């Protein structure tokens, strides 16, 4: 059990800490990441990633090297989009509407979605273990 939040809400962080539930707040500034970590977050969602850059992760890790970061919001299911985030130190990436396209869902084209997921997982595996790519 865990909670993912779209924003860094201190009251939610305090509540989660009090009941022992991990939370993953959404942060868009270094200050928000700092406050989230102060409130017990070990994992932070960088949102919206498409308005930030992988350099943001490197900057955060320069002052908070132990925090794990997940860019979400605008990360595309392509190697060109994913690789810079991993190169900067992202733990993983979050994808929603970029991976599960409305038109594919509306058409019932679940095979296309499944193939895209496999492709993305292959990209990630190659980034995590370059000797096997």
Predicted regions, residues:
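Catalytic beta/alpha-barrel core
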Residues: 1-8, 21-29, 33-34, 42-51
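Catalytic cores of alpha/beta
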Residues: 31-39, 76-93
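Mobile acidic interaction elements
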Residues: 63-66, 78, 109
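Glycine-rich phosphate-binding active-site loops on the catalytic face of alpha/beta enzymes
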Residues: 7-12, 45-54, 89-109
């Amino acid at each position: 059990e865990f909670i993912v939040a779209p924003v860094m809400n201190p009251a939610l962080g305090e509540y989660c800490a009090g009941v022992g539930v991990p939370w993953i707040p959404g942060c868009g500034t270094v200050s928000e990441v700092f406050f989230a970590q102060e409130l017990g977050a070990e994992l932070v969602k960088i949102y919206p990633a498409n308005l930030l850059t992988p350099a943001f992760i490197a900057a955060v890790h320069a002052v908070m090297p132990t925090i794990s970061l997940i860019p979400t919001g605008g990360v595309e299911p392509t190697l060109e989009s994913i690789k810079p985030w991993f190169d900067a130190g992202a733990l993983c990436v979050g994808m929603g509407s970029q991976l599960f396209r409305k038109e594919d869902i509306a058409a019932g084209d679940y095979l296309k979605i499944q193939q895209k997921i496999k492709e993305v997982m292959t990209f990630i595996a190659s980034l995590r273990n370059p000797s096997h790519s």
